[in-house]
């Protein structure tokens, strides 16, 4: 059943949303941005980690792990491994790849540990995903940072999936200039 995990201090809304989503028959997961989340409120938990990418992403891995554990408890992970893979890319992997290489090593190691033995750690499940999603997850499963060139390729391929070629080129240029969003 649906449980609000009070042990999760950061991202508890995401964990609860996925508890509901995984058990709903009429809800679809989309990666479109539905609202602009304001993270700049002084003293908020999000504000404290805003400029420390590694710490923030390691917290995101904890959020993902809580969702994964909840879905594993009721056997939902096996039926929705592709959704879990997409969510992982949106929540953790894309931003980890922005760190380009060795700086994302701890994050990728944490992701590999979280996925170990899960339904997402499965070639058959990844075959159900878009190739760019499967490639990002497979890179994370290795548990160490990809080379900077591969990071850029994985990001570009994922952007093509989400935004088309033109949108991906715009995001690539923004990433090269150090901007977060286009």
Question: Language-model segments: which ranges?
Answer:
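Amphipathic alpha-helical repeat scaffolds of TPR domains
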Residues: 83-95
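Catalytic core of nucleotide-sugar-dependent glycosyltransferases
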Residues: 32-41, 47-76, 102-121
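All-alpha amphipathic helical-bundle segments outside canonical DNA-binding/catalytic cores
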Residues: 75-85
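Conserved nucleotide-sugar donor-binding catalytic segment
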Residues: 1-50
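Membrane-interface aromatic/basic loop that binds lipid-linked glycans or pyrophosphate carriers
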Residues: 101-182
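Short charge-dense sequence patches
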Residues: 7-19, 60, 152-157, 171
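Residue-level recognition of short, structured coil/turn motifs
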Residues: 25, 75-76, 178
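Short glycine/serine- and small hydrophobic-enriched flexible loop segments
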Residues: 22, 65-69, 94-98
